[in-house]
């Protein structure tokens, strides 16, 4: 799906679209209701990419951590959505690789000046998805109480991912 900016609205690939052709256009069908857009998201997992990047020791985030977690989830049959803070682009060990993954849509970067946690938890709530993160989200748990049952902790040991075994019990 492509979006046009306000600057390019009203233009076709060949130039300006005549205004009369716009007035003769067939009315668009009503947008589907949000429920219709939901579909089956049972395999969607939201990944706290900034948390994952900084799970290794050091002052810079490690892009390989994000890729390792994502690849493991894909191999397990899940559809990971990796969300990161905008500031991560300046704190990652492989800036070129990071920008490539953002451009490809593998990594979703929260808008600058916003808290990625809001987007992570909102997506998880909207899609009824689990969240891979070692963050406890203590400041948001009252707003998103279902998070207690959906939060999946992890470790990366010698390049291998170990996810917390879920027992269904959570305090």
Regions found by a protein language model. Name each.
Residues 3-42:
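Acidic, polar low-complexity linker/tail segments
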């Amino acid at each position: 799906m492509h979006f046009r900016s306000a600057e390019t609205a009203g233009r076709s690939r060949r130039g300006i679209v005549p205004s009369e052709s716009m007035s003769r256009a067939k009315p668009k069908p009503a947008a589907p209701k949000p429920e219709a857009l939901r579909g089956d998201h049972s395999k969607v997992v939201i990944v706290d990419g900034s948390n994952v990047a900084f799970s290794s020791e050091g002052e810079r985030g490690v892009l390989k951590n994000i890729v390792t977690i994502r690849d493991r989830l894909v191999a397990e049959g899940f559809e990971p959505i990796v969300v990161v803070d905008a500031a991560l682009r300046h704190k990652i060990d492989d800036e070129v690789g990071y920008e490539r993954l953002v451009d490809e849509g593998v990594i979703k970067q929260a808008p600058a000046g916003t808290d990625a946690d809001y987007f992570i938890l909102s997506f998880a709530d909207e899609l009824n998805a689990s969240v891979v993160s070692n963050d406890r989200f203590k400041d948001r748990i009252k707003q998103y109480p279902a998070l207690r049952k959906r939060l999946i902790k992890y470790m990366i040991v010698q390049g291998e991912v170990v996810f917390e075994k879920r027992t269904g019990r959570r305090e």
